[in-house]
Every structure is written in structure tokens, then in C-alpha cells.
Amino acid sequence: MNILGLIVEYNPFHNGHIYHLSKSIEKTNATHTVAIMSGNFLQRGEPALFDKYTRAKIAVENGVDLVIELPTLFACQSAEIFSHGAITILNSLNCINSICFGSEEGNTEILYNIAEILANEPNKFKLLLKKYLDDGLLFPTARANALFDYIHQDKKNNFIQNYSKEQLSKTLNSSNNILGIEYIKNLIHLNSSIKPFTISRVQSEYNSEEIESDICSATAIRTSLKENTDLFHLKNVIPEKTYNILNEKIDNGFLPMFDDFFFDILKTIILRDMDTLKEYFEVNEGIENRIYKDIFTSEFLHELQLAIKSKRYTLTKIKRTLNNILLGIKKSDMQLIKNIDTIPYIRILAFNDKGREILKEIKNKSEIKIINKFSNISFSLDDTIFKTLISYDIKATNIYNSIYYKNNKDLVKGPMDFYTHPIYVK
């Protein structure tokens, strides 16, 4: 058994994901695939278009064998924390042979050598970084300059000696390269036997909002869905199984979810918790004062985000910060989990027969607990990390479903994490 690990959001699963899946299997000679997938809220600090079970089912229908939920506390954070959670899960399974991710760079060796320097932080590199930061450069620019200087001083790293500062900076700051470097850094920190691979992203940029071919970015699809929920205009850019499942959800009253839908809930929390806003993760440096001031004059969430945005606070950073407030994510809880080197449990969202084979392998090779639904938990809840992780997953699901099920309230019998089974795809 040769098991490939994938780290995904599938928001939604489109033709580019089919390409990534097939090329990853081809590159690694994998016989089985496991996807670690974000739940109902995502790394950009926004809700998923459709619920985690629907997205997991679509993934398995399109060729993934097993989908495991990435806990909310990891799923909604920076690339560093997001990657740490996903890689820690894969490493804790003790049966994953490789990971494969898309990147703008497309060269595993280059990304690995960059990650190795950033993971080990040699003294020369740290001194160079400090110098550029002391010169007043922003961290991304300072890091690129320090890395460029270090590489040209260290003869071992001739793999990118010909890169200019601009090329290196672009490599370091491209969306998928950032995640890929963080994946590899975490593999190094964990001394993992999992082998990293990458494939080049094709045609569409990660953040592109244009639909120009049959492979486009998820961003472009989300932008299109926000303007028109009729899926017919997306038929050429998503697989048939994705199209059919999402069409059925929409026909049954489950509309795509966007962050503005949660603005009233967020506004209530901000007005109620003004005195304690700084307890939420990423609420630092007095930003709570700007949030409180601008909440009164903002009619929509996007309006609030843009009002707070500045050179110091990027839009993505603002979105994550506000999402942390929405989900009640506290600094103290993030401190508890952000450096753990094992995960106490995995939550299964969907699987097929080959996924069953993977689960059997996990049971044979790992002590990790496997959860199908929270009502079936039969082991001790004394584990603080375990309790912290699942409590936020439950909160996130409940908050998400309060809007997602507004046209289907009769289907909600209580906290759905307690009674929803993993989806088996024959």
C-alpha cells in the first residue's frame, strides 16, 4: 500500500483539483489517497461555500479515498499554523508515504532547500534577517533579502544561485509556494518520513477572479457564484459529479455561503465583548479599537474589513482576525495547540472501500483515535488538547449551520457533529 496525503479545501472541487489529484497519484505511484480537508470555515477566514460533508462526498466521488477533517483551530489560521495542523495529522497516522501539493514554483528541490534554511534558521541567516528588519523593511521583504544573501554566501545552496532577489521574493510570496514551504518545514521539524512532492499549477493563478478556460481558480468560481447561483455557467470548469451534487443541494434550498451572511452574528459579538476583544487570537496592537470604531458605520462585513485594512493589516489578516472573533477563538487556546507534535484523534468525513483499507492500516500502525461522530466518543475526555480541538469544531458547525440550514430548519435536530455519520461512497 502506497498512501498519498493531500491537504485541501475543495471550495469547491473543480477541474484543477482533478488535475492535481491525477498528477499527484502519477508522480508518487500512490495506490491510495487521504485528503486532510478544512471543515466549515477556511484558511482565508471565511465560510466554505457548502458544508464539509457535501464537499467531502464530492471529493470521494471524484477519486479521493478518505477525507479527514482538519480541526477548525488549524483550518482558519495563517499558512504556518494551517500547515502545522495538516502535516501533524498526516504524520500521526504512521502510514502516509508522501504528500503532493500544487505550487507556482513546481520544483520540489528548490522549495525543500528554502524550507530547510527557514526551518533550521542558521545563525548567519538570523543575523541577516535582523539586519534587514532593523533597517525598517517589512518582514516578507526582509526575509527574502536575508535568504538571498545567505544563499549566495553558502556554497552548499547553489540550486538557486542564479535567482535574482525579485525571483526569490516572488517564490517566497506566491500563495501556493508559501503553503508548500510550510508543509516541508513541518516535515523537517517532525523528522517525518513522509516524502514531499510538488506539481506546477496550470493556467490559472490561485487568486485569479477570471474564468478563462476549463481550469480556473476556486476564487473565480466563488466570485461567479456570488453573482449567480445558477451552476449552469460553471459546467465547463467543474467535474460532472461536483455539478450534480451541488445542483441538488441548491435545488433543496442550500445556497452557497459567503462571509457577509455572518455579519449580524459578528456585530453582536463585537458589541457585547468590546472589553475582552483582545483575548481573541490575532487581535493585537490595538486593532480592537479600530474594529469597535468601524463596526458602527459598516453596513456589510466586507465594508468593515476594508475600513480596518491598512498597510500594516492585510485584508486576509483582517478576515482571519474577524473570523476568530466570530468563532470565539482565544489566544490561550491557540497557544495550547499550535506547537503540538501529535494529534489525539481524527474525524472521518467521507470514504470509499479503499478508504476502509486505509483506516485499517491506521488502526494497525497508529494509536490515534478514529471518530465517526462525536456521540460515539468512548474514550476519556481528560485530554485538554482533545477537548479544546473538538469544542471549536462543534462551535464552528453550529454557527455555520445556523445560516446554512435557514431554508431547512426541520432537518436540524441539534448539534450536527453529534449525529452526522461519515459518508460512505460505493
Swiss-Prot record:
E.C. number(s) listed in UniProt: 6.3.4.-
Task: Output the GO biological process annotations, alphabetical, semicolon-separated.
Answer: tRNA modification
The keyword ATP-binding is annotated on this UniProt entry: yes
As given in the record, the signal peptide range reads none
Give GO terms: molecular function aspect only.
ATP binding; ligase activity, forming carbon-nitrogen bonds; tRNA binding
Against Pfam families, the record matches this protein to: HIGH_NTase1
Localization in the cell: Cytoplasm
Write down the Gene3D superfamilies for this protein, in alphabetical order: HUPs
InterPro entries assigned: Rossmann-like_a/b/a_fold (IPR014729), tRNA(Met)_cyd_acetate_ligase (IPR008513)
Q: Where does ATP bind?
A: 7-20, 102, 176, 201
Q: Which residues cross the membrane?
A: none
Similarity comment: Belongs to the TmcAL family.
Q: What is this protein called?
A: tRNA(Met) cytidine acetate ligase
Q: What is the lineage of its organism?
A: Bacteria, Bacillati, Bacillota, Clostridia, Peptostreptococcales
